[in-house]
């Protein structure tokens, strides 16, 4: 039996708003992306709502939705997803927090400690475990993205804003308060500064002109989610290709294997060629691939339009181009979309619907001939909830017509 191949390619934060510096166009409109444009001309286009009304426009919510799980039912928080990605098993009452290493004085300077190296971050996490008296434990992740786990369901109600949403704002104004659990988290965040500022890793970074990690920021907490495995839903094997712990963790709970790609960093310097090569090769073993590229989101957070354009072009050439070549030997369906916009001008996520292409066997072309935030509005898909995308992707009998 011939098995259809299914691919979802996510350019994280790829969508944007028109920019004066681009003569009123978006990075997607300006980028040279022949593969995306050709695919748009061959398939059906529209807008997907990846973030349900009233929920935060996080990559956790948005990618959960794209994978086919309605966040209103399945989402518990970002922390447990990242715990799964690094093999940390949570008990029923364990609450997992995302633990950013950040640079701050009285204000938050950045949310990533100058994109600290993973080995440096690991040393700092060891020091936090050794020096801070806490009922929980810190776990090293990748670069500034780390984890803190503590027992007690009351910690789920602590409100802390994501640090990437409050860069430039007062630290004190955004520390949690109002409950015993919130006070404990606030104390940990403040006490971390005393541990980190004099650490040899930070002293060395400062001597090299790099930003030190001056404190931790705990946020995005939640309990372990309960999700129906992908194989039980659709009866096929799937895998993720991503350098971001959050997406790996989503895959773990969904029963998707993660394919490690050497040189994939989750940043602007990621090896696009390697991601494309490994994705193409994985089609020989897996019938579903979720390929995620973080770079456009990082460019959006940095407010760098040229870097976002470059990231889009690299995804198009080295990832999508390679995938389309490999898929030509198979019956297939492929979707290309961002998880959410990360507009250059505001440097954070917004919940706006995202432009989507769905192409392949059983999908009739509409009149859209290029791919961006505006052309897709004329497409045959219209606007719909992103968690329904998988229903169409995985139903071999489904046929999308104009």
Swiss-Prot record:
Pathway the protein acts in: Carbohydrate degradation; glycolysis; pyruvate from D-glyceraldehyde 3-phosphate: step 3/5
Enzyme class: isomerase
E.C. designation(s): 5.4.2.12
Molecular functions per Gene Ontology: metal ion binding; phosphoglycerate mutase activity
Keywords in alphabetical order: Glycolysis, Isomerase
GO biological process annotation, one example: glycolytic process
InterPro entries: Alkaline_phosphatase_core_sf, ApgAM_prokaryotes, Metalloenzyme, Pglycerate_mutase_ApgM
Covalent S-S links between cysteines: none
Function of the molecule: Catalyzes the interconversion of 2-phosphoglycerate and 3-phosphoglycerate.
Designated name of the protein: 2,3-bisphosphoglycerate-independent phosphoglycerate mutase 2
UniProt source species: Methanothermobacter thermautotrophicus (strain ATCC 29096 / DSM 1053 / JCM 10044 / NBRC 100330 / Delta H) (Methanobacterium thermoautotrophicum)
Lineage: Archaea, Methanobacteriati, Methanobacteriota, Methanomada group, Methanobacteria
